[in-house]
Amino acid sequence: MNLGLAIFLIIIALLVGAVAGFYGARAYMKKYFKENPPISEDMIVAMMSQMGQKPSNKKVHQVMNMMKHQQK
């Protein structure tokens, strides 16, 4: 009986740890990408210049807002 209870508790502890680890890592990554977006305004300006567009502040801010909205 003691062995069965010990195995059961170990399995439950592993499952709880896996779920907690998943949600903890997910929250950390969301916070990280919010603070450090994968693309910056300078990168957008360079990309628009390479495509032959004249990067105005309005266009750059529109693209940044679209990217922030997609991350949510």
Curated annotation (Swiss-Prot):
Topology in the membrane? Single-pass membrane protein
Q: Where are the transmembrane segments?
A: 3-23
- Say which domain of life the source belongs to: Bacteria
Q: GO cellular-component terms in the record?
A: plasma membrane
Give yes or no: UniProt keyword Transmembrane helix.
Answer: yes
Query: Where can this protein be found?
Result: Cell membrane
Q: Which InterPro entries match?
A: UPF0154 (IPR005359)
Entry keyword annotation includes Membrane: yes
Write out the entry's keywords from A to Z.
Cell membrane, Membrane, Transmembrane, Transmembrane helix
**Disulfide bond sites:** none
Q: Hey, which family's this protein in?
A: Belongs to the UPF0154 family.
Protein's UniProt name: UPF0154 protein lhv_1362
Q: What organism, scientifically named, is this protein from?
A: Lactobacillus helveticus (strain DPC 4571)
